[in-house]
A protein has these predicted regions:
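Ligand-binding loop in jelly-roll beta-barrel domains
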Residues: 67, 87-111
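Conserved short histidine dyad/triad with adjacent acidic residue
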Residues: 22-25, 37-53
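A short, N-terminal "cap"/entry segment at the start of jelly-roll beta-barrel domains
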Residues: 1-33, 48
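Short, surface-exposed secondary-structure edge patches
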Residues: 38, 58, 72-76
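Short, conserved beta-strand element in jelly-roll/cupin
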Residues: 40-42, 51-68
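Short acidic-glycine-tyrosine-enriched beta hairpin
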Residues: 73-87
Length: 111
């Protein structure tokens, strides 16, 4: 298991910085999982709205409070909340707070 940390600025049209710690490498994930990672979004930053094609994504919230856009609907997420964005659908997430937003992200490939 080789963990890899990636830093992104204004990812998918968002604002500020986010950090993705990939917990498993592709060889460990197999063909069904595209990404399993711990994601941190800096205070007052966001991951912009984007659509999924050929895969779906789930978030499990760990720390902080988020504004989550699920297609056309926005809602607040707190630790313990889970989301799922299906193939062909879109989402984005914003950290409006003064502390980092931390969540697990799992991207599952369609077969």
């Amino acid at each position: 298991m080789k963990q890899k940390l990636e830093d992104y600025f204004e990812r998918c049209g968002g604002k500020g910085w986010m950090h993705i710690e990939r917990l498993l490498v592709p060889e460990e994930l197999g063909s069904h999982v595209k990404m399993y990672a711990k994601v941190t979004i800096d205070p007052h930053s966001s991951l912009g709205y984007h659509e999924h094609h050929g895969d779906g994504e789930s978030y499990y919230m760990l720390e902080g409070e988020a504004i989550y856009q699920d297609n056309e609907t926005k809602r607040t997420l707190k630790p313990g909340d889970v989301t799922f964005t299906a193939d062909g659908k879109g989402h984005g997430i914003e950290n409006p707070g003064d502390t980092p937003l931390v969540f697990m992200a799992l991207i599952i490939n369609n077969d």
